[in-house]
UniProtKB/Swiss-Prot annotation:
GO terms for cellular component: cytosol. It comes from Actinobacillus pleuropneumoniae serotype 5b (strain L20). Pfam families: DUF179. It comes from the Bacteria. SUPFAM superfamilies: VC0467-like. InterPro entries: AlgH-like. This is UPF0301 protein APL_0232. Belongs to the UPF0301 (AlgH) family.
């Protein structure tokens, strides 16, 4: 097995032959001998976080204090009916949280959604529907085939950079210019 990739970015290369993952950045939430799981962080859906919370019938959802234009992301092709929330550490504990790094958690329980826009909410968060998973050794094989580049993750790219700029920014962190990153196969 490669180094543990938990808490790092996977950046799709032009070698990947899968339209779903073309030009994606994936935040790896878990990586061990059982495989890997991550979330695509640069593919917005047409559903805003506000619309999602309103549909889930949380009280006073439209009066909460968060970015009203923040979109729900398509986290991957697996379990697309399930929510995955990457967020910064908070004082509040949530029902189903998993520590990815010292400051980043992955939560799959609805209580984190109910907290959004309230004082106890995580300062920064991403809401995804679906995830990406790999069987044991599958991700390592894809990396060996040059489908993915590996980069250190950072809060700016994860939470602040515009969704569609995240792939170029992640490449630039590796010294690959935007023009080279966009080059495809002939």
């Amino acid at each position: 097995m490669l180094e543990n990739l938990q808490g790092k970015f996977l950046i799709a290369t032009p070698e990947i032959d899968d339209d779903y993952f073309d030009r994606t950045v994936i935040y790896i939430c878990e990586h061990n001998s059982n495989g890997a799981m991550g979330l695509v962080i640069n593919t917005p859906t047409d559903l805003s976080v506000l619309e999602l919370i309103t549909r889930m019938d949380f009280q006073m959802a439209n009066q909460r204090n968060y970015h009203k234009d923040q979109m729900v992301l398509s986290g991957g092709p697996v379990s697309q009916d399930r929510g995955f929330i990457i967020h910064t550490k908070t004082e509040q504990e949530f029902l189903h949280s998993y520590r990815v790094t010292d400051n980043i958690l992955l939560t799959t329980s609805g209580d984190v959604l109910d907290s959004l826009g309230k004082p106890e909410a995580p300062e920064k968060f991403i809401v995804c529907l679906g995830c990406a998973t790999w069987k044991p050794e599958q991700l390592e094989q894809e990396i060996a085939r040059n489908y993915w580049l590996i980069s250190e993750a950072n809060d700016k790219t994860l939470f602040e950079t515009g969704y569609l700029e995240r792939w170029v920014e992640a490449n630039e962190m590796l010294g690959i210019s935007g023009v080279l990153a966009r080059a495809g196969r002939a």
